[in-house]
């Protein structure tokens, strides 16, 4: 009886999602279907598969599959948007380029991982107007849960840049094996976002990560040295990296020293 009720609720949710979004996107409702996302998107212009489920199981499985979990809210209805890019932005650390003035702007700033995940997540969410927020309340709850209790090797993290006690830049993302994926970030001071990015690249490189998954192609990522990988090529690299092991260092580090090291080694 319980399974029948779950089946009925699941089907009602799928039909509701279809009614809200139309027939333009594939829709799935179970964890096992996430492995079919590349096939569902094959030959399509769209980069999203939708699901009425936003929970740790679905989000973690989407991450493991090389997709980036996003969400959308219409009224009180939230749904998962599982994104698999046609081309993924990837930074391989020998390609890192430090833009001019980054080091001078880094003076006095320190970077920490997971010092205050909730604060950083809230700052990232609030950096964007409500109409542009894909970090919905339910997705934020799930990301917080995965931070406190990783699932299937997926752990969420906050990258935070401080000037004293003030949080001036940061981002949220997730780690699987030796791959870190950026989800979204913010900055409150000119240049602090670039300081955060270059400092994080140095941390990832020195901590044994294979590469940095930067998600969507944006000009500033190419300026840092990121390159675009077609979907199939990216997934092959991603699965290789997630089978390896790496982790973040404890405590906080000087952004200026990290960036100086980047300049010396290149």
Predicted stretch roles:
Residues 1-266:
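N-acyltransferase acceptor-side catalytic subdomain
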